[in-house]
Design a protein with these regions (language model features):
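Flexible, membrane-facing loop/turn or short amphipathic-helix motifs
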Residues: 38-50, 111-123, 148-160
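Tryptophan-anchored aromatic micro-motifs
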Residues: 22-53
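Bacterial N-terminal signal peptides that target proteins for export
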Residues: 1-9
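A short hydrophobic beta-strand element
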Residues: 32, 104-108, 134-152
Length: 175
């Protein structure tokens, strides 16, 4: 009987330790394949040879995909570094902080490409932030983009100011 209680206590302790490993940096650490897409609501002013036009539009982001690594910083405070190697494009990195079962993305500067109908693609600087949760082998980032900028599109100059954003990055853990 004492042996059975001892085995049950050891099993319970092992389960407790395993459950603790499912929070914080250990929950997110790994190598992933990611895809980012979404849209922003933006005030858009376009200046060209025909004059100026201004409106508020929902603009699609140019989809990005590639490889992502989420690494512990070793600081013991839940600090992490996220690196994104965009297929055929840039590499970016930013800091995040694991808090329980959430990953908080610290604000970082990046560039985004917006599809503007009839005019082409505008590239502007933004500040991104947000949070993420892990579901099985998938991490879902909900991102917020803020910023404004000017971009040359063919013969036109576009001034873009982001009012709202709906952006997700889905990252699937690689085997």
């Amino acid at each position: 009987m004492k042996k059975t209680i001892g085995i049950a206590a050891c099993a319970a302790a092992a389960l407790l330790l395993a459950a603790c490993a499912k929070e914080g940096p250990g929950l997110f650490k790994g190598n992933y394949t990611f895809k980012t897409s979404g849209s922003v609501s933006a005030e858009l002013s376009i200046e060209n040879t025909d004059g100026n036009s201004s409106s508020t539009l929902d603009l699609d982001l140019e989809t990005e995909q590639g490889q992502m690594d989420i690494l512990k910083t070793g600081s013991g405070d839940g600090g992490m570094i996220v690196t994104m190697n965009v297929l055929g494009g840039d590499v970016r990195s930013f800091r995040a902080r694991a808090e329980g079962s959430s990953l908080i993305v610290e604000p970082f500067d990046t560039k985004i490409k917006l599809q503007i109908a009839r005019h082409g693609t505008a590239t502007i600087d933004v500040t991104a932030s947000g949070s993420a949760k892990r579901y099985g082998d998938v991490v879902i980032f909900d991102l917020v983009y803020e910023g404004e900028g000017v971009s040359e599109i063919g013969e036109s100059t576009a001034e873009v100011k982001i009012c709202d954003s709906s952006v997700q990055c889905i990252a699937k853990l690689n085997d």
